[in-house]
Regions:
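Glycine-rich phosphate/adenosyl-contacting loop at the front of the ribokinase-like
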Residues: 1-74, 95-97, 114-117, 265, ...
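Conserved post-catalytic alpha-helical subdomain immediately downstream of the catalytic base
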Residues: 264-333
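Conserved phosphate/ATP/ADP-binding segment of small-molecule kinases
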Residues: 172-259
């Protein structure tokens, strides 16, 4: 079985019940999530051999965090244990015209304070086919940027396919710093995942004719973004998600895959959102699964978008649908009727 390694931070998520605001909350629901961990869970859920690499404290909350991955079948044996802090983030779910809000409390988390010598990449990459990371990981600290670069170099040396979701987070670093660091890291990447905001924020590449707030998405603009990214870094594939925001609850959702020659667009879904956190990660998980299982370009983008569409109907960061459910939606069964 093909093995995948995902590298990054896993955090505890605290959210008011339902659509409650932070200012109303007297209790919080506890779950766990993080961009790369969410991808690992998706892949394990599809029956793939997926491992997550990070540094997580040994205390009880850290163990609960690790157990959340084990429950979903993710290999946690490569996680470094130690440090004092587990990152925390708070999510207030939006409704109608009120947007969702996220507050991070992740400074000095164990993974951000990790040292290069704590990760033996020769051992971690033993028998591995695919390595996935996101732009969040090198943004956590200078050490993490150096560790991510070391991992990419070792993966490339071993012939491992490398994917990266640009995932720009302005609360972690500036556009200038992100552009400098990511430009070096992306030299090693085979598959780039992004949206139009990431491409603009990190590399100054803009999708002409697109205004996501107005729901205006230009296919030609997205094609140009993908081509510029591929030409600049030599990516074999560029996948770009297309989200049209109608309200906090209702979005149009689609994506495009560029293979260096042709652009393939998925069908468009109008989603009534239950929880959009992890939606992009479930797209990445679906993309990796499809590519590793020999799907053609059109099948790949349809599977990835359908997986992400379904995730956004599920509470929490983790996608919890089967391959058959994704294939059914990708094949046109979008009625939502009761299955008996």
């Amino acid at each position: 079985m093909k093995k995948i390694v995902c590298f990054g931070e896993l955090m505890m998520r605290l959210a008011p019940e339902g659509y409650g605001r932070f200012s109303q909350a007297d209790k919080f629901q506890v779950t766990f999530g993080g961009a790369e961990a969410n991808v690992a869970v998706s892949l394990a859920n599809y029956g793939m051999d997926a491992a997550f690499v990070s540094k997580i404290p040994t205390h009880e909350i850290g163990q609960r965090c690790v157990n959340s991955l084990r429950f979903h079948g993710v290999d946690t044996t490569k996680i470094v244990r130690g440090g004092e802090r587990l990152g925390v983030y708070y999510v207030e779910k939006g409704a109608s015209q009120r947007p969702s809000k996220v507050i991070y409390d992740r400074a000095y988390a164990a993974i951000a304070m990790a040292k290069p010598e704590e990760f033996n990449w020769d051992e971690i990459f033993e028998g591995v086919t695919w390595f996935h990371w996101t732009g969040i990981t090198p943004a956590l600290s200078d050490n993490m940027a150096a560790i991510t670069l070391e991992a990419c170099k070792k993966a490339k040396e071993k012939g491992i396919t490398i994917s990266c979701d640009l995932n720009y987070r302005k609360k972690l670093w500036t556009r200038e710093k992100a552009g400098q660091v990511m430009a070096e890291l992306c030299k090693y990447v085979d598959v780039c995942i992004a949206n139009e905001e990431d491409a603009a924020d990190v590399f100054g590449i803009h999708a002409a004719g697109t205004d996501i707030n107005a729901g205006t998405l230009s296919h030609e603009g997205y094609k140009d973004v993908a081509k510029q990214l591929a030409d600049r870094f030599g990516f074999k594939y560029v996948a770009i998600t297309l989200r049209g925001s109608i309200s906090a609850n209702d979005n149009d959702w689609a994506a495009m895959l560029y293979d260096g020659k042709e652009c393939y667009f998925s069908r468009n879904y109008r989603i009534h959102i239950v929880d959009r956190v992890g939606g992009g990660d479930s797209f990445g998980g679906g993309l990796i699964y499809s590519m590793l299982n020999g799907y053609d370009a059109q099948q790949t983008i349809e599977f990835a978008v359908a997986a992400s569409c379904l995730k956004q109907t599920i509470e929490g960061d983790y996608n919890q649908v089967s391959v058959d459910e994704v294939l059914a939606l990708a094949g046109g069964n979008a009625s939502g009727r009761v299955q008996r």
